[in-house]
């Protein structure tokens, strides 16, 4: 029975470590749609506008 508290503590540590690892992954999933302007860059060249991370501007 002495091992039971140790097992409980280990489970808590593992679950908290999983939450720490999972947190940034959730943030990355949420931020992924923001990278769309980079993907649309080729489309924007056709309209005479260049879009980068800093924003869009006229292309010459």
UniProtKB/Swiss-Prot annotation:
Residue span of the signal peptide, if any? 1-19
What are the subcellular locations of this protein? Answer: Secreted
Pro-peptide residues, renumbered to this chain, are 20-48
The entry's comment on post-translational modification says:
Contains 2 disulfide bonds.
Which GO molecular function annotation, any one, does this entry have? toxin activity
Its keywords, alphabetically, are: Disulfide bond, Neurotoxin, Secreted, Signal, Toxin
The primary site where this protein sits is: secreted
Q: Is Disulfide bond included in the keywords of this UniProt record?
A: yes
> GO CC terms on record?
extracellular region
Cite the record's tissue specificity text. Expressed by the venom duct.
The answer to whether the entry has keyword Signal is: yes
**What does the comment on domains in this protein's record state?**
The cysteine framework is I (CC-C-C). Alpha4/2 pattern.
Q: Family, per the entry? A: Belongs to the conotoxin T superfamily.
**What is this protein called in UniProt?**
Conotoxin Cl1.1
This protein's species is Californiconus californicus
């Amino acid at each position: 029975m002495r091992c039971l508290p140790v097992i409980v503590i280990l489970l808590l540590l593992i679950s908290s470590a999983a939450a720490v690892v999972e947190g940034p992954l959730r943030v990355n999933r949420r931020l992924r749609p923001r990278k769309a302007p980079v993907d649309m860059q080729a489309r924007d060249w056709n309209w005479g506008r260049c879009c980068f991370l800093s924003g869009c501007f006229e292309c010459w």
